[in-house]
Amino acid sequence: FDAMRRDLDAQGNAAALDRHQAQALDIITSPRVRDAFDLSREPAHVLARYGHRLGRYPHQTVKTILYDWDARPFIQARRLVEAGVRVVTLRPGDWDHHSAAEGDIFFALRCLMPLIDRSLTALVSDLRDRGLENDVLVVLLGEFGRTPRIAQPGPGREHWADAGCAIFAGGGLRMGQVIGQTDARAERSRTGHITFQNLLATIYRVLGVDPRAQLTDFNGRPQYLLDDP
């Protein structure tokens, strides 16, 4: 970050940035954001709460398959938010369990589910303890669902666009509710479709952005943030 800022200043490229680019540059090169990556500033009991370690979990039969887990991004996400970063994305673990090539899905989830449960719970609880639960929205989701039936050979699960799930916590939203319902096999929606556009509209509103807003692109044409907010 420091080297990037020096290079931009030395070459004069920073002067050519627009308002949004300059704001982004100021954020990622600020001392507060840089310090957010320094986990040595976190007390030991906080690190332990998240399950602070990089773990490698060998497959029970295919010894070359290892499941990695690192709780540090969860802590860094909270620290980045405290430093003023508006949106943070993290990708914990490896959830690509299609077939035996990626390992037995049952073994993999027995490894990974307790780990993400601990780290995600710690993040949500930590934000609440710091009085940030209404200011920060935590979203856990993938880009699609998974086949309701186990795929063979495998065992594993393939991509499934007809139904999926997401977890929302905080952001001033009402907690403790389940929105939507599938059939008994989790194959199809029974209560009408809740689309990714709808999820993005909720996220935009929490960020203070009108999901119905219309912007003008570089060609002077109007563009909507979402087609179906």
Where on the chain are the PLM-derived regions?
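Ligand-binding pockets and gating/stacking loops
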Residues: 1-229
